[in-house]
């Protein structure tokens, strides 16, 4: 199995979003995946002040803290790497075959983060036929983190920002980010996003970004 390369896997889910839990577990069951649920952390709104008046800021940095908590748990368990999913992740039908190719290539390169999809923000250059080097990606609904990057994220203050922009913020020479050539995952556009308070409609954004930046 492709997951044999990874020491563990979590999917992030708020206790209040039982709908997303059911949908995600139904999707993983379809592929025969066994992914551990990780309860999302939630700050109290009154404890978090956003300097530019974003009423949903406490939710966004709660997501950041949740990702930090997953990385901390992976390190505590002694995992050399960890798959991280968010509960609105949707696997493409050819996920298994394409992911297997990517994993085969990952074994032979140095990497810190591996994105299974998302919105690249700059040109991505090929490493192999299956994986590309990227400067960063918007979206953290499906990625893997290597032990080489654990301490980097564990030293971050969650109030610095949204998790995907934090990953983007490191200088290119200080990170080894890899992205799948093919979109392996999307997000459920029919599910209301807690971070944004609306249907995000990200599928077309991701597809268009891939067309633009994957050379």
Question: For each of these PLM feature ranges, what is it?
Answer:
Residues 1-85, 89-215:
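An acidic/histidine-cluster motif and surrounding catalytic segment
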């Amino acid at each position: 199995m492709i997951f044999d390369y990874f020491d563990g896997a979590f999917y992030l889910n708020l206790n209040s979003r039982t709908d997303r839990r059911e949908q995600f577990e139904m999707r993983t069951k379809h592929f025969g995946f066994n992914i551990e649920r990780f309860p999302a952390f939630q700050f109290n709104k009154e404890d978090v002040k956003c300097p530019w008046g974003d009423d949903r800021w406490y939710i966004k940095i709660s997501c950041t803290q949740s990702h930090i908590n997953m990385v901390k748990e992976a390190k505590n368990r002694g995992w050399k790497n960890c798959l991280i999913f968010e509960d609105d992740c949707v696997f493409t039908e050819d996920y298994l075959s394409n992911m297997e190719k990517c994993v085969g290539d990952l074994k032979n390169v140095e990497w810190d983060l591996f994105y299974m999809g998302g919105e690249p923000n700059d040109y991505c250059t090929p490493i192999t036929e299956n994986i590309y080097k990227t400067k960063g990606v918007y979206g953290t609904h499906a990625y893997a983190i290597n032990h080489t990057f654990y301490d980097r994220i564990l030293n971050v203050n969650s109030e610095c920002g949204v998790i995907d922009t934090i990953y983007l913020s490191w200088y290119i020479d200080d990170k080894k980010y890899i992205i799948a050539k093919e979109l392996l995952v999307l997000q459920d556009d029919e599910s209301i996003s807690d971070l944004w308070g609306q249907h995000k409609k990200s599928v077309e954004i991701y597809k268009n970004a891939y067309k633009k930046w994957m050379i």
